């Protein structure tokens, strides 16, 4: 049985392109998302391309659900070779100074808690694989850049910015922690709008999902630099 890539946060755009890219390279593909209709359509589309695929419904904010879905994927598809974390909560929070401080921690439920839960659950497989990897989709709102901070405030996306910045740090920590155990950890940061996934905005780069998937494949194969940027 081929190695499996687990894609958490499946939908149109990046995760579809990643599924097709890795599937074309011989991976079986496990899709995880909340929407059963989206999952069903995704599996059918991949199978039409000759790719082995299966789907599991789970909420990326729920560690137990994510662990359960990964266990089911392992039982059905075999050894997990790659985790692709594409899940995104979209919690902007608006003005942080007006937000309930007790609610701010929820922005990390997907970006940190969910991601870490998935890695922990798949870790034994990833270590046993000769080229195990964790690949993370991130966004430029997390950049430590005053101009980007201004954009995030204007877009009422301060919560997203916090989550993205924390996610980038977690990628670095996991990369350092797992490097000597043979597991590669890397991220692709999207600095723009993925074509077909939202309205295009003047002055904001439009990027192709296929280019992002190719960047993930490049990181996976090279296993050197842990970060790439598109846009």
Name what the model sees in each region.
Residues 26-41:
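Conserved glycine-rich Rossmann-like NAD(P)H-binding loop of the short-chain dehydrogenase/reductase
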Residues 165-231:
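C-terminal helical subdomain
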Residues 11-12:
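Conserved glycine-rich cofactor-binding loop
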Residues 48-64:
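Rossmann-fold cofactor-recognition segment
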Residues 97-116, 160:
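Catalytic Tyr-X3-Lys loop
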Residues 8, 80-89, 136, 186:
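Rossmann-fold scaffold of SDR-type NAD(P)-dependent oxidoreductases
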Residues 110-130:
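Amphipathic alpha-helical dimer-interface segment in Rossmann-like NAD(P)H-dependent oxidoreductases
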Residues 107, 127-128, 133-172, 179:
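Catalytic loop of short-chain dehydrogenase/reductase
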């Amino acid at each position: 049985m081929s190695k499996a890539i687990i894609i958490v946060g499946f939908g149109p755009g990046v995760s579809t392109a990643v599924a097709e890219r890795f599937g074309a390279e011989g991976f079986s593909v496990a899709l995880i998302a909340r929407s059963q209709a989206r999952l069903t359509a995704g599996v059918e589309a991949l199978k039409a391309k000759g790719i082995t695929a299966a789907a599991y419904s789970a909420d990326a904010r729920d560690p137990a659900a994510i662990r359960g879905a990964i266990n089911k994927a392992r039982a059905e598809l075999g050894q997990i070779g790659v985790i692709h974390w594409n899940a995104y909560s979209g919690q902007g929070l608006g003005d942080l100074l007006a937000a309930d401080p007790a609610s701010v921690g929820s922005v990390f439920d997907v970006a940190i808690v969910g991601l870490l839960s998935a890695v922990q659950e798949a870790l034994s497989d990833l270590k046993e694989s000769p080229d195990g990897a964790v690949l993370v989709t991130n966004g430029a709102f997390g950049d430590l850049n005053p101009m980007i901070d201004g954009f995030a405030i204007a877009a009422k996306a301060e919560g997203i910015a916090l989550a993205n910045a924390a996610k980038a740090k977690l990628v670095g920590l996991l990369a350092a922690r797992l490097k000597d155990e043979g597991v590669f950890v890397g991220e692709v940061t999207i600095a723009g709008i993925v074509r077909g996934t939202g309205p295009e905005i003047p002055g904001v780069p439009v990027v192709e999902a296929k280019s992002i998937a190719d960047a993930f494949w490049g990181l996976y194969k090279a296993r050197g630099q842990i970060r790439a940027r598109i846009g």
